[in-house]
Amino acid sequence: MLFRGGEEGQIRKNLIENRHIQAIIGLPANIFFGTGIPTIVMVLRKKRDDDKVLIVDASKHFIKDGKNNKLQASDIKRIVDVVSNNRTVPKFSRLVSIDEIRANDYNLNIPRYVDSSEDAETWDVYASMFGGVPKSEVEQLEEYWNAWPSLKAELFRDNGVCYACDHDDIATVVRNNADVQAFIASYGQAISGLPVDLRSRLVEHPEQVDALGQETAIGKELDAMIAGTPLVDPYDAYQKLDDAWGGISIDLEVLGSEGFDAVRAVDPNMVVKKKGGKDVEVQDGWIGRVLPFDLVQRELLHDDLTAIEADDRRVQEIDSEIETILEGFDEDDKQNSDAINQDGDAFVAAELKKAVKAIGKNPASDFERGLVQAQKLFDETKKLKSGIKTKRNALEEKTRDTIKALSDDEARRLLEAKWITPLQKQLEELPNAVIDELIGKVNALKNKYATTYADVCGQIDEAEKELAGMLGDLTGNARDLAGLEELKALLGGE
């Protein structure tokens, strides 16, 4: 379609010469079920005065979703933004003149106009021989040095021809840099007003919110907030918003259709279980229609939840203590005791109880004392698990009653904890992703030239000498020994 001749070529020529093609968008391969071929979107206009065509290569922007590739919301927004603004973006889009297309005989194959491939890795000959980090490769990280002017000098020492990096812990140097810390603080300040704005937009009257319109409006506001922050990709921020919006929009739909009181609704948790060989739907506890039980427990019933978690931790500790007891036993004792399985890695509950009963109150050896202690721990676990089950059931009932009795202010606070707090935390992590990316690149540069060609040759020479020495210990017939002597000579052995 984009480059074949014949009638297809004539169609392309007519569309180009009549200014009907506004944009050609190349999409990733394998995004449609059942076909792995790359696809394109051609944006056509009946009347255009522009003599340029926007060509977009979005083939690298996707995530894996099982066997298929999937466009994320941020990928779609990236495409929409460049097409709406008719904008050239390096390695993504380019405005191509009709004259250039004519010169290419109306061939519209996207790689002819937009090169989205990764730059090939290069190796500096001087640094490969003498070590150090080439200045040209350090300067490729210019966007970071522009954002954090003092960092390059802290990381690299100029030795004239190359840079030297003397730091073992690159991450600490980067994170402690004053400009980097100022960057984190500045970004945090830029988005600090978002929770207040989201409370006003979403939480005050959630039953009246236009979900689709608000996502668009919030996206624009978020974009404006971080517009002055270097390095942070606004499309990454938008993706965080869209990821959160999936759950938020479902809640807004429920509240919009049922009213604010739906926030206090609790429904039977229906699950499918096998009964008499058939799938039967039965109730398994309760779930909040809008507010998850675990959220309510964490925010309003913290003491009850903490008590259960403490018991859970104790059960795990007991498991470790029992394992330690087993590991401390002599192998002969393990093999001669019915209280321990044949593999020696677990107790046999019934036999352990019999053995402890037979031991009585006065164990005569370390092994018997270990068995008694293990039984005590098993008894404690049984009691704890029974108590945990009782506490969980009581907490579930208490959570159900708490949700039903929520005041409007409590309900709004919980909506904020569900919708806004996690999103804000996700957004606050974006600078750390940028910093981690630079740390990875600097470490890669340092390691790339850490071993010089002379070092490699020396290692090879040492390995050859070691191998030649080992060959001298081999024996065989005269024919084999002659071959080994020749190999030793090739390796430089005597």
Question: Model-found features: residue ranges?
Answer:
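Short, charge/polar-rich alpha-helical segments
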Residues: 297-315, 378
